[in-house]
Amino acid sequence: VEDGQVQARLVVAPGGEAAARAAVAAAGGRVTGALGDALQVWLPPAALTAVATAAGVAALGAPDYVQLAEVTSEGVARADADAWHAAGLRGQGVRVAIIDAGFQGYNAKLGTELPAGVVVKNFVDGQPDAEVDATTAHGTACAEIVHDMAPAAELYLLKIATDIDLDQAVTYAIGQGVDVISTSLTFLNVTPGDGTGKFAAMAARARNAGVLWATAAGNYREQHWSGQWADA
């Protein structure tokens, strides 16, 4: 709850976006983002039922929030990155956007574990850029690994909380001319898992703009099961 309102994900019925947006406004809420047929909205709790049943609204529920994986680094030597560094290849002229749920403590590491200067941007609703340094140190750890591997690269620390925030961050990164997007994030059970869906579309959009997207994989390999669906 923030300022008496809760964040929600509104799925728009076909052809109903104008009506859905009007319902949100009439309830005293606001729309802060959009992705496909979904709107990211803030609403008074008392208005949730009315908006959920309004014209133009197919569904209303909790946002698709990001989940964080563990961060483990075996260091530069294990990757033989030090050999590249010795050859003068240290990431000069490369811009890397690290998209994460928070970069707590990053300020204290500037000039040591991180470059002396970084670009920060916060895409979480209602949060200023200063609150990039909050919530979790997961993104800070990821940025440190990137800096270890490419110490001369320029880093962009972009904070998100939802799938729609992520889409906005990707758009920003492309507009800033970044060369690499790095994510170590998970969204559980919100895409088909077959290389299609909203996240695949984001990655394709970045790739078409000449951006390499590097992402963590396999963190949940022993924590899930899949099989053919059967009606019990």
Model region roles, listed by residue range:
Residues 1-136, 145-148, 154:
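Autoinhibitory N-terminal propeptides
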Residues 137-143, 153-232:
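Substrate-binding/access-modulating region of protease and related hydrolase catalytic domains
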